[in-house]
Regions:
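Membrane-interface helical sensory segment of bacterial ECF anti-sigma factor regulators
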Residues: 3-55, 148, 157-159
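Conserved beta-strand->loop/alpha-helix structural units within folded catalytic cores of enzymes
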Residues: 41, 53-73, 100-101, 194-210
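Active-site-flanking ligand-binding surface segments in enzyme catalytic domains
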Residues: 133-214
Length: 245
């Protein structure tokens, strides 16, 4: 009689095709998951790096506008010493009034912020602000006029008088930065904790700690630990648009 057929490991096509299909899908899913795990941090880093570059470019534009204003007036835009328009963010309408900034080109917005996503941001004119004094609309205008950036609150002299922000181009003296949260402890627009600072001389610096290591000076607090105007010419606190000196 003929020998019995040798045992074969082959599986009938009816059984093997679905099995291979399921296995292929599992392998593809696992590969996609692994790629996501590996690439997601890189993608987030790339997004944050792009946002940082754009913020630094915006500070470059603002530095040029501020220096142009200072060249003409021998001081930087300074808020009134008192009154409803005595706000950090008044620098923006002041620069727009002299055609040094464009009201609606997004220079004052951090990419991805709520203001930038609204698509409606526009720096109000000084006349709009004056007309809004005494109305509920004023608070909305002063909160938004400075965009996503904060501005120096200047300093007061020994008698308590608010002083003009002089054009001395100091390389260690902040004039603008990312706007602080309302508690004045850190910036609000960068998830990583990054702070961008524009100094008087036009230099832009990135820091993760708003307290300067060399002298323990706080970016958003004066030497008395308050979010208010400085107590001497070397004291600087950066306030959000609506903050008063």
């Amino acid at each position: 009689p003929p020998p019995p057929p040798a045992f074969s490991h082959e599986v009938s096509p009816a059984l093997s095709a679905p099995t291979r299909s399921v296995l292929d899908r599992v392998i593809l899913a696992a590969t996609a998951l692994a790629a996501t795990v590996l690439l997601a941090p890189l993608l987030l880093d790339s997004i944050e790096a792009s946002r940082t570059r754009r913020v630094e470019q915006k500070f470059g534009v603002l530095s040029g506008a501020l220096h142009g204003y200072a060249d003409s007036h021998r001081e930087y835009p300074t808020p009134p010493a008192s009154g409803p328009l005595s706000r950090a963010g008044l620098y923006a309408p002041t620069l727009v009034a002299e055609h040094r900034l464009t009201a609606d080109d997004g220079t004052l917005l951090v990419p991805g912020s709520s203001l930038s996503q609204s698509g409606t941001f526009r720096i109000p004119s000084v006349e709009e602000l004056e007309e809004a004094v005494g109305t509920a609309r004023l608070e909305m205008l002063v909160r938004q006029m400075g965009g996503d950036f904060g501005y120096t609150l200047s300093h007061r002299d020994a008698s308590g008088e608010l002083q003009p922000i002089r054009d001395t181009r100091r390389g260690h003296h902040p004039i603008m930065a990312d706007a602080p949260a309302d508690h004045g402890l850190h910036a609000i627009h960068h998830p990583s904790g990054l702070h961008h600072i524009l100094f008087e001389d036009g230099r832009v610096q990135r820091v993760f700690d708003p307290v300067f290591a060399e002298d323990q000076d706080h970016l958003y607090r004066n030497h008395n630990g308050v979010l208010a105007a400085g107590v001497d010419p070397d004291d600087s606190a950066i306030g959000s648009s609506h903050h008063q000196p």
